[in-house]
Amino acid sequence: MKIALLSEKYTPDIGGLAISTERLARLLPSAGHHVYVLCPSPNLLPSEKRTLTSNGVSVTRFGTRKRVDDTLVDWFEIIVEEHRRAPFDVLHAYFLTQAGFVATYAGKYLNVPSVVSIRGNDIERAAFDPARFSHTLYALQNASVVTTNASELVKKAKAFFDRDIILIPNGIDTDHFKPLEQISRLLQTMRLIPPEASGLPSYFGMKQTSPFQLTVGFVGELREKKGLKVLLPAFAQVNQKRPTTLLIVGVVRQGEDKQFFDEFFTLHPNLQIFVTGFISPGDLPHYYSLMDVFVHPSLRDGLPNAVLEAMACERPVVATPVGGVLDVVKDSENGLIVPANDAESLSNAILKLLEDQPLRNRLGKAARETIQKEFTLQKELDLNLKLYKTLRLKD
């Protein structure tokens, strides 16, 4: 089959949307399908279009315009042009709003089945945004199939418009995301880590006041939605009882979030907080293995890739019961669940794990077993292929 994947973000863009779209694009050619990714890019001029093909995936990026509606028109016209050159069998959009609307409308126009995948923010916020409401409703009403990666998002989508929603959880490559104990011990016990000894990028270096100081980690773009204003106060509370390092693998979002972070750091200059900047997905397992505790204190979410990756790396996880987190993290079985927006509960859970190595080990091993059984790449691929085949038979 010839499958078009529409997404507002795609590798090397950062974020869960880019990661998830790229993951499916990479899996489909292994099953014999032809994949065409169509993605807007603010780094290209309006009307500029570039196509790169690698490993069976053709990625076409086109320049965005000042007006969103003009960008959507371009997106639609590119789909029509590509379809007339060599017809698509399925149009699959990642994200309910812009990509979902364009895929659904183009699918109706071209008589091609459309799949719209809800990822999190698209349904969490679009329902309250007048500018996106009509596109969201149109996609939900008219897409051939709607999927999502979290059971909580199924409920929210059905509340928006009552129709069948198919649950397809994210999959994780457990051969790549796995515990790397030797590197973890090396990096945690050295006061200054030489890049040549770690095998990590040259800008990664970490000083510790004690070789026995433990590390709490977060992965992703730290911002208010991801619990920035909860994590930092909780970390300060932890340090009142036990000196600890906070390792942020990723970036802090610019603007108000960065201002809050800088002001917090000014008020707490003695806290050990390290921000790595963007890290290639290929290097992430090394960084997960640095963490004695992984935290994901989101206020809203889909099914966070970072939580699944950390669990696959046998990290004990502390997370909040939002989005699809409860689909994977079972409190006290393979991780700890704390209320969202509650710094005291978060700090208590972190301390509980820092002070109990057997508990950390037990939860970490159970976490990896959960991923290996229920959140595999093969399962994600099989569910999508089953969906495509059903649509093709109906068509």
Walk through the language-model features, giving the residues of each.
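Conserved acidic donor-binding segment of nucleotide-sugar-dependent glycosyltransferases
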Residues: D331-S332, L336-A343, K352-P358
